[in-house]
Amino acid sequence: MQLLKSKRLMLLLITLASIFAFGVTTSLAQEKVKTKRKDYSVMVKYETFKVDDIEGHALNLYESRGVGVGSTGENAFISKGQSDLVKGNGTHQGYYKNTDKDGDVFFSKWQGKVSTTQSPEGKPIMKWEGTFSYVKGTGKWENIQGDGTYKGGFIARGIYVNYVESEYVIKK
């Protein structure tokens, strides 16, 4: 009889431990969110510094502002960056501050490559692509973690479009 009570108690404890462990494991699992958006942006500041070590080498500092539209809704953003280009080809990097319609913000850091070709009319066509990672968030974006890719290019003087895909989680 005592043995039967011990077995029942042990079975009850194992069951409770399993329920607790499963519940904790489930709550620790974070749902990954995949996003796609299209960013429209205008350069508002642009400064070039010629390096003069080789022909066409320049460092550029810039700021752009724009609107993103996609799977997470609409948002306004500011992007600040720099590029190191030789005849329009090279690298770029910077930071992105996104503010959604509720005023919540996330920041990301981006880096990539820039390439420039000539159109049949002889005009330069500048395109870029790269990666980014989320670095901080406020409000609903607090504890955001993840990364993504972007591709873009100028569509008119000082106006560009980026196609952005990402995956993120909000850590609890």
Feature names for model-found ranges:
Residues 5, 21-23, 78:
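Compositionally biased, low-structure terminal segments
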Residues 12-23:
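Bacterial N-terminal signal peptides
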Residues 3, 26-27:
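Glycine-centered signal
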Residues 28-172:
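Beta-strand-enriched cores of mature, soluble protein domains
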